[in-house]
Amino acid sequence: MRRRRAPIREVMPDPIYGSKVVTKFINKLMWDGKKSTAQKIFYNALKLIEEKDKEAKGIDIFNEAIENVKPLLEVKSRRVGGATYQVPVEVRPVRQQSLAIRWIVDAARNRNERTMAERLANELLDAANKRGAAYKKKEDTYKMAEANKAFAHYRW
């Protein structure tokens, strides 16, 4: 373990929307340091969203998708006397955001559309409408927390 907690590095807001969440999303989308490719994919996905849903702005759909996928609870393993319990714990806001971003990117990668921009656009639309794989992941996490509510007193 570390002697002290690693400092949280500030990210620069993205050039188009001026949002740090967008920058974090693009960084999570990026592979092999190819940031410009990740930016193209992300901005094309938002354009596709705006083409599909004329009256909605792509960035609003993106923000709504992130909010809908953010988990408030998760389960952590805790060993007590030889038994391992799944203990429900609250999720800190920074972790809520990073989990939501990770789940949306993973769900988009596992979809079957042709281009990554299409996959991402459809996953963001699904998440904004409370469906899709990323939203299901959040619901499954809640079910696990609910099923293990009896062990909540083992919180640390």
Swiss-Prot record:
**Molecular function via GO:** rRNA binding; structural constituent of ribosome; tRNA binding
- Its Gene Ontology biological processes? translation
Write down the Pfam families for this protein, in alphabetical order.
Ribosomal_S7
Mind naming one GO cellular-component term on file for this protein?
small ribosomal subunit
- Keyword RNA-binding listed: yes
- What keywords is this UniProt entry annotated with? Ribonucleoprotein, Ribosomal protein, RNA-binding, rRNA-binding, tRNA-binding
Which InterPro entries does this one have?
Answer: Ribosomal_uS7 (IPR000235), Ribosomal_uS7_bac/org-type (IPR005717), Ribosomal_uS7_CS (IPR020606), Ribosomal_uS7_dom (IPR023798), Ribosomal_uS7_dom_sf (IPR036823)
**What does the function comment of this entry state?**
One of the primary rRNA binding proteins, it binds directly to 16S rRNA where it nucleates assembly of the head domain of the 30S subunit. Is located at the subunit interface close to the decoding center, probably blocks exit of the E-site tRNA.
Q: How does it assemble?
A: Part of the 30S ribosomal subunit. Contacts proteins S9 and S11.
- NCBIfam families, alphabetized: rpsG_bact
Q: Which family does it belong to?
A: Belongs to the universal ribosomal protein uS7 family.
Name the UniProt record assigns to this protein = Small ribosomal subunit protein uS7
Origin species, per record, is: Nitratiruptor sp. (strain SB155-2)
Q: Lineage of this protein's species?
A: Bacteria, Pseudomonadati, Campylobacterota, Epsilonproteobacteria, Nautiliales
This chain is encoded by the gene named rpsG
